[in-house]
C-alpha cells in the first residue's frame, strides 16, 4: 500500500501538494486529525508551516512519515527544518533564513517554498479554507513542484490518512469542502473542458493523470503485489465495508488506486446519499465507510489532490467511473484546473448516476468478480481485483461512454487515452496478475465485459499493441512500474495517437467484440453498457469474457481493460495472457521473430562449436580479408625462413634497454649527489646553517660571509626562489606593513642616526640579540630571508652597512653608521636598550604593532640580523623602498641612509611616528624613551621613541 499510497499520494500529492501547498492544513486536517484534531489544530496553529518542509518537526509530527522526520526533533532552527541538510556555510544558525533554511539554499524537495514555512501562506494553508485553495492551480503547480516531497509526505500522509478513519473522515470532510471547491474548480475546469472531466479525467489522467496513473501505478504496484494482501488488505478493510467492487477498486492497479479513490465514490452509491458532502465528500465519506477507508485515504489524498474527484464523487453512484474519472479526472483536473467543466461535472454526475445503477450492478459484478477472484488464487484475487478494478473502471468507462457520447470526442480521446493508460497500467498489472486475471477477470468480466468489451478490446488492444512492444521486454516487469512506464509512454504518445491507437486497437478488437471505434464504442458501449450494465452487462461480460477466452486472452485483456476500468486487475491479467496469445502475443511473437531474425546467426552459432564458427567465418571472409590474411601468412613465412631470430625475446630486449637506462640514471645520480643534496636541503635549513652560523660567528662578517655566501649562492635556485617568495610575501606584507617596515626602516635610519650619535654598543648588543633572534627567525624564515640577506647585502653597498644589515635590518637600514656599533651592539648591548633597537622596535612595532621593542624587533629582527640585512630587511627595505614612495631613499639611501639619516630618519620619522602611534608601547616607550639617549636630532623624536622602546625593552 505504500506504493498505493504513493500513487494515491501521487495524485493526492498533486492534490496534497496543492493541499500540501498548505499541507499543514491538509495534513493537519487529515493527518493531524488522524493524530488528533486538537493536535492538528495545535499544529496548524503552532506550526504555521505545518507544511512538510517548514513546520518544526514537533509541529510536524503529523508528517513523521517523512524521511526527514528527524527535523521534528531538530529545532526549527537549522535542525528541525532540515532533515540534516547541511546548513552550508553562510547559513548561520538562522532557523528559517531564506537561504539559511535547512535545505541547502533553496533546496526544498518537499518544501513548498522556504518562506512558506513561516510564511502566513503556510499559515493560511494551514487554515482549512486556504487549504481548499490548495487544489487551485497555484497550489497544484506548487504541488507539482513539491510533487516528490509532497508525494512522499502525501504518501505517508496518505498512509496515515488511510490508516486513520478519523483522518479519512476528515479527508472526506476536507474533500467535501476542498473537493467542493475542487469540484467547483474542477467543475469549472470541467466546464472549461466540458468533455474534459471524463476525457480530461482520462487525458489528465493521461497527462497529469499519467503521472498520477504512474503514481497510481506505484500505488497499484503495491496493490498488485499485495493485491489482496496489502492493497486488498488495507483497501479490503475499506473494501470490506464496500461491495467487492469497492474492494476491487481497493485492489485496483494504478487506476485501481485512482479508482479506489473514485471507487469509493462508486461504493459511494451506498454513501451516495452523502453526495451532499459533494462527490468528494461522498467519496471521502464513502471511502471512510469502506473501500473509502483506504480508497478514502487514497481518495482523500486523491481528492485532496483532485477536487475533481468531487465531481466524480458527486455521482458517487458511478462508483468506479466517478472514482476513476473523478479521481483521475479530478486529479488531472486539479492539475489542469482550467480543464474541468461544471457542465461536465453535472453531465458526468448524471452519467455516473446512470452509471450508479451500473456501478451497483458492476459492484455486483465486482462482487461476482471478487468471488471469482476469491475463487481464483491469491493472484486470482489480485486478478479479480484487477477485474474489479477493470470493472470499476468499466463502470467509469461505461459512465464515460455516454459521457463521451454526451461529451466531445476529446473526452473520449482523453478517456481513451486514460483507458489506454489504464490498460497499460492494468496490462502491466496483468503481467503479474494476467494468469489469475484471466481466471478471475473473465468471471468478473462476465459482468463488466459487455460494457467494456469493445472498450477493453480497443483499449486492451492498444495496450496490447503497446504491450506487445513493452511486454516483450517488460512482460514480467512489475505491473506498477510497467504501468507507469506504459502510462508514461501513453502520456508521451499524443492523445490523438493514443486515441488512434485505442481506436485502432478497438477496431481490431472490434472484430472480437464488434465495437470497432473505441470512441464510438465507448459512447455506444457506454449507452449500451449502461443499459446492459444493469444485469446484462455481467452476463455479457461473462459472454465477452468467454468470447475473449475463445478469441484469445487478448480480447479478454482488452475487454479486461474495459473491465480494467471496471475490474482492471482481472482485465489486466487476462490482457497479459491474452497479450501473449493475442495481438500482444502476436506482437510479442513477431518481435521475437524479428529479434530472432536479427540475431539468427548468433542464435545458430550460439550452439556451434568454435570450429564451426571458424569455418563459417572463413567461408564468409571477404576477398580483402583473405588478401590481408594471405599477405600476413607470406610475411610470417618469409620471416621464419629467411630472417633468423636472435633468440632474444622482446621482453628480454626491452628489459636490457630498461636496465641500461636505470644504470645510466644511477650513474648520473652518483655523479652529482651534492647537487641533489643541496637542492634537497630546504633553503631554510641551508640558510639556518649558513646564515645563523655566519651571523653568529661575527655579526658583521657573518653578514658579509652570509651575504657573500648567498651572493655566491644566488646560483642556488632555492635562494632565488625563496627570495622571490619572500619578496613577494614581504612585498605583500610590506604592502600591508610597508608603513611598519618603513617605520622600521625609518627606525633603522633613525636608529642609525641615533646609533651613530648615540650608543652604538647598545645597538650592537641589541642587534646581536636581534641578529641572533633574527638568525633564528631568519633560519625559520628560510631562504627567502637568506635571499633577502643576499639582496640586502647586495644592496648594502658598504660592508659595514652589510654588517649592520647582518647586525640587523635596523642596521642595514641605519646604514653603516658606526659599524663598530654593530659588532659592539651585537656583542655588547641588549637590543632593548639600544634606541636603534627602539627604532627597530618602532618599525618592528609597525609590523608587530609594537608589542615589544625587543619583541617587535625580535619579531622582525628575530629573523636573524642576517635575515634583516639579508633578504627580509635589506631587500625588504629595498623592496619597501621600491614599493615605497621612498624608493630612491630605499635603494640609494639604504647605503647612505645610515649616514644620511637626516633625510631618511625624517621619512622614518614619519613612519616611526605612525608606528609609535600604532604601538601602544610607543607612547610609553616614547615617554620612557626620553631615558634613552636621543643623539640623533633628526631622529630625536624617533630616537626618543626608539629609546623609549629600546629602553623599556632593555629595561
Swiss-Prot record:
This is Thyroid hormone receptor-associated protein 3. Residues 204-220, 282-300 have a biased composition (Polar residues). The lineage of its organism: Eukaryota, Metazoa, Chordata, Craniata, Vertebrata. Residues 359-955 are annotated as: Required for mRNA decay activity. One of its GO terms (biological process) is nuclear-transcribed mRNA catabolic process. It comes from Homo sapiens. Its main location: nucleus. Residues 58-75, 144-155, 167-188, 347-377, 414-452, 495-521, 540-550, 663-680, 691-761, 881-895 have a biased composition (Basic and acidic residues). Residues 266-276 have a biased composition (Pro residues).
